């Protein structure tokens, strides 16, 4: 969901926490969401329509957002005296992998017969969240 005002407050220091990302409830839900987002993107391209964009700011502060196939992409800039003082990006991968919350939700309640099955389930969950960077899985037996 586009919410540039909430991000502006966070980056200006008037909010303690960034907005909470929407996390899928299951691996299947994550894939369904990605399919819907791909359909929206394809329809926009076919119609020659712009992709949704939102912005907020003032007094040298600005936040811009757009929807991507993997979620909301946010860019923020602070300009003072004609110079960029701060520039930040919050990508969908940041939102889903900044902590273990999304993966924990996708894997909650699962039990696996073997380390190989656990690795397969974890890999499916990571792929459902669609990171934009390469990743390596490391399992530690507890």
Question: Can you say where each PLM-predicted feature lies in the sequence?
Answer:
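Metal/cofactor-centered catalytic core regions of large enzymes
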Residues: 1-142
